[in-house]
Swiss-Prot record:
Protein name: DNA mismatch repair protein MutL
DNA repair is among the record's keywords: yes
UniProt organism field: Clostridium perfringens (strain 13 / Type A)
Chain segments annotated as transmembrane: none
Keyword annotations of the record: DNA damage, DNA repair
Highest taxon listed in the record's lineage: Bacteria
Molecular function, one GO term: ATP binding
Record Pfam families: DNA_mis_repair, HATPase_c_3, MutL_C
Sequence similarity: Belongs to the DNA mismatch repair MutL/HexB family.
Listed NCBIfam families: mutl
Reported function: This protein is involved in the repair of mismatches in DNA. It is required for dam-dependent methyl-directed DNA mismatch repair. May act as a 'molecular matchmaker', a protein that promotes the formation of a stable complex between two or more DNA-binding proteins in an ATP-dependent manner without itself being part of a final effector complex.
Statement: the UniProt record of this protein carries the keyword Membrane: no
UniProt GO BP: mismatch repair
Length: 674
């Protein structure tokens, strides 16, 4: 039977450190929060090797009393609270008294501090929780703490650290968030002696946002605020141009504490999606100020999660604030003056009348274009006394030649048999019988469709001629066709290609099919180092947020081998000179940003091949889109290319590209068989 042991101080501190100090960014968080609690207005953070070698914090706060310097490193020693009652009304960021002893137990610490009332400060040096010296020192008011060799005595913890670039990015992201919460404090961040961040501390939140995220972000923000008796909500939300595929650019602060709360994040996103259907996540910086008694921050070791006394109420306040601001923003964009609304109504009536006149004119032309035979003069007389309005009332269907089909009616089928029976027509020339079959009418539609097709294909870069691809499609893993050669019937809703083979109907999603073709070709080109590149006419300079730049810098070789020629341009800026050939018509800035976001979500443990595949998946942006009109030849070539790729049945995102219905299945749906 194991007996109960009392752990020694060193072991207990290391256990506590495991909860409080997960990685270098945890150290930065605890120390910067101490500086803010001390009333500092200027805080400098220096790190080396992702914070593993050195973390140095300098502030101009109130400092620590000389007699309290050594006491501050004792477990549960704090100046923030005195008894249990204070726990339920916390006004400071820190309060447990765990940070300093936890950090000192797993690192080498040099702590200096001086208050306004003393001429000299105190310097305390601790290594692995053991005091080495306590001496007087000369310094200005404030505190300076150096943390070196983090986890030097807990080597097992080092295995869980990510790369230096990743740890640096986490620290940068943390300091960015803290800067947003404290616009009246000037923050400086140095990484390996290079200045990464410098905020002005002028109290203007928009200036901090501009410094961190750039000018374009600051210019596309919508301010919101809502005030209730027990809570105030305010902040900025980005318009749809700032929406991204991840939540990386979302910041939530409660009483200036950066926290994560799924419910409140959903409140903002729901309000945003009421006016935008982008399917992406909005940019926002949200502040909630409430009474300390109404929240509990003592539910998580890192205080990154909090509990509200009435979370439903806070949810509603947040939703209403954002929803109201978005509604006004959209309203300002689309509202018409009263005079213009009246003009619009008048114009609408005019268009309706004009449309009716055209329909009547079309019916008149119908009599001249349909070849028919009549055996009795009486029937001929009935035809020439034809009353269009009467037939409208009778809802008689009339077969109209393609030449006279209006754009609105091109998707309808016109059958003349039943309609002409009602008018007692005896014969109709088979040559003039009309059915809306794209194969039969493609020559008539050719001129009308070609202009729209050319425009859409120029945008998508899809080539009709297979030779434009060279032999690349044939080189992708297998030449064996994966499904039979199909006969194209037409295009439905400008999105789906209809084709048939052996009494089976095939529906192909043109966008999903084309993006999979591009994906496999691009992946193959990357693997063979044969990516065709397209120089930009004018090289584009892009300034990235610091975190994004660090990810780019870590994956430079990946971008280069993927067909991008990018050079550094100073101060987190890059110069895009060349891109893969089929991406040259896309926005390079959005493309690079999306690729970096994809790499962010992957982490650093993925292989180079996985990263290449993630970048290759961006080829979908160059694929033909829904609502792109394709000619029969273009659809045939698209399907033919799809037949010979490795996996033609799913797009890079896992959605199906092609589905089929047998004649038997269709007969069952129409109850022709049981």
């Amino acid at each position: 039977m194991n007996r109960i042991n009392i752990l020694n101080a060193d072991t207990a501190n290391k256990i506590a450190a495991g909860e409080v100090v997960e990685r270098p960014s945890s150290v930065v968080k605890e120390l910067v929060e101490n500086s803010l609690d001390a009333g500092a207005k200027n805080i400098t953070i220096e790190i080396q090797n992702g914070g593993e070698s050195l973390i140095k914090i300098i502030d101009d706060g109130s400092g620590v009393h000389p007699e309290d310097v050594e006491k501050a490193f004792n477990p549960h020693a704090t100046s923030k609270i005195k008894d249990t009652y204070d726990i339920f009304s916390i006004n400071t960021l820190g309060f447990r008294g765990e940070a300093l002893p936890s950090i000192a137990s797993i690192a080498r610490v040099d702590f200096k501090s001086k208050t306004e009332d003393f001429d000299m400060g105190k310097e305390l040096i601790i290594s692995g929780g053991e005091k080495e010296s306590l001496t007087d020192c000369s310094m200005n008011r404030g505190t300076q703490i150096e943390v070196r060799d983090l986890f030097f005595n807990v080597p097992a913890r080092k295995k869980f650290l990510k790369t230096t670039a990743r740890e640096s990015a986490l620290i940068n992201d943390l300091v960015n968030r803290i800067s947003l919460a404290n616009p009246d404090v000037s923050f400086k961040l140095f990484n390996n002696n290079k200045k990464i961040l410098n905020t002005y501390g002028n109290g203007k939140l928009i200036d901090v946002i501009r410094t961190i995220y750039g000018k374009s972000t600051a210019e596309n923000l919508i301010y919101f605020e809502e005030h209730k008796d027990t809570a105030s909500v305010y902040g900025f939300i980005g318009n749809d141009t700032l929406a991204r595929a991840s939540r990386n650019n979302q910041s939530l602060f409660v009483n200036k504490r950066y926290v994560k709360n799924r419910s409140l994040t959903v409140a903002v996103e729901n309000a945003f999606r009421s006016f935008n259907v982008t399917g992406k996540f909005p940019f926002f910086v949200l502040f909630i100020d409430t009474y300390p008694e109404l929240i509990d921050v003592n539910i998580h070791p890192t205080k990154s999660e909090i509990k509200f006394k009435d979370e439903r109420f806070i949810f509603k306040v947040v939703f209403d604030a954002v929803h109201s601001a978005m509604r006004e923003y959209v309203k300002d964009t689309f509202t018409l003056p009263e005079e213009e609304e009246k003009k619009f109504e008048a114009l609408k009536e005019e268009v309706i009348q004009e449309s009716l006149d055209k329909e009547i004119s079309t019916l008149e032309k119908l009599k001249e274009n349909i070849n028919y035979k009549v055996s009795e003069d009486k029937k001929k007389e009935e035809i020439y006394s034809y009353n269009p309005s009467k037939d409208y009332e009778a809802k008689t269907e009339v077969n109209i030649p393609v030449d006279f089909l209006s754009k609105e009616n091109q998707d309808e089928s016109f059958s003349i048999n039943n309609s002409l029976e009602n008018n007692e027509f005896k014969e109709v020339s088979a040559k003039r019988e009309i059915s809306y079959d794209p194969i039969l009418i493609k020559n008539e539609l050719k001129d009308k469709v070609s202009e729209s097709t050319s425009e859409s294909l120029e945008r998508s870069d899809y080539k009709c001629n297979k030779n434009e691809y060279g032999n690349s499609i044939e080189e992708i893993i297998y030449r064996e066709a994966k499904f039979p050669k199909l006969r194209v019937i037409g295009q439905f809703n400008k999105t789906y290609i209809l084709a048939e083979y052996d009494s089976t109907l095939y529906l192909i999603d043109q966008h999903a099919a084309h993006e999979k073709i591009l994906f496999e070709k691009y992946s193959s080109d990357i693997a063979k180092k044969k990516v065709e590149i397209q120089p930009l006419m004018i090289p584009l300079v892009v300034t990235l947020p610091t975190e994004d730049y660090l990810y780019y810098d870590e994956n430079k070789e990946i971008f280069e081998k993927a067909g991008f020629k990018i050079s550094d341009f100073g101060d987190n800026s890059i110069r895009i000179e060349e891109v893969p050939y089929f991406l040259d018509k896309l926005n390079p800035t959005e493309l690079i940003t999306s690729m970096i976001n994809n790499l962010k979500k992957m982490g650093t443990g993925e292989t180079v091949e996985v990263k290449y595949n993630k970048i290759a998946s961006m080829s979908c942006r160059a694929a033909v889109k829904a609502n792109d009109v394709l000619s029969i030849l273009e659809m045939e070539n698209l399907i033919e290319d799809l037949r010979y790729i490795n996996d033609p049945f799913h797009c890079p995102h896992g959605r199906p590209t092609i589905i089929k219905f047998t004649s038997y299945e269709l007969d069952k749906k129409f109850k022709r068989i049981t």
